[in-house]
Regions:
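Active-site hotspot residues in diverse enzymes, especially metal/ion-binding acidic/histidine motifs
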Residues: 1-41, 46-144
Length: 144
């Protein structure tokens, strides 16, 4: 059992979902194979804690879908963020595998985050003295 933001986090034998939050308790599916995947699941559940109001189990409801997405975006920004992409580049990561390893997230989580950033920012965005390119491939360029 661990505590994050005053929440209790436990591994449980969940059915279906890999993570669940109720009040101040987060359950992570016990048989999730890696710590990286568990960390990504925990990040999304923390996103629900910070952004979700009420019960959103019914994802047929548009409002619930929006809240689910908002929690996921919180997780992307918390675990990766644009500055995380820059830090990984500065560390020497030049492919998704090494970047995901450096950021301690799964490749799938990183891929989904980049897809979100591409949709939000388009082909590229500027952050401090860097340009992050999302198309045609992920790339970071330091401005001098």
């Amino acid at each position: 059992m661990k505590r994050h933001y005053g929440l209790i986090v436990k591994e449980k034998p969940l059915q279906g979902n890999k993570g669940r939050i109720f009040d101040k308790k987060i359950a992570i599916k016990k048989d999730v194979p890696t710590l990286k995947e568990k960390a990504c699941i925990l990040a999304e559940e923390l996103g629900h804690y910070h952004t979700t109001v009420g019960n959103i189990i019914d994802l047929q409801n548009v409002r619930n879908k929006k809240q689910e997405l908002r929690a996921r975006l919180w997780a992307y920004n918390n675990q990766i963020g644009l500055t995380g992409i820059i830090r990984a580049y500065e560390y020497g990561c030049h492919n998704l595998y090494s970047m995901a390893d450096y950021l301690d997230v799964t490749e799938e989580f990183l891929h989904d985050a980049i897809k979100y950033y591409r949709g939000k920012y388009g082909e590229y965005t500027a952050v401090d003295n860097y340009i992050i390119y999302f198309e045609p491939y992920l790339g970071v360029m330091k401005l001098i």
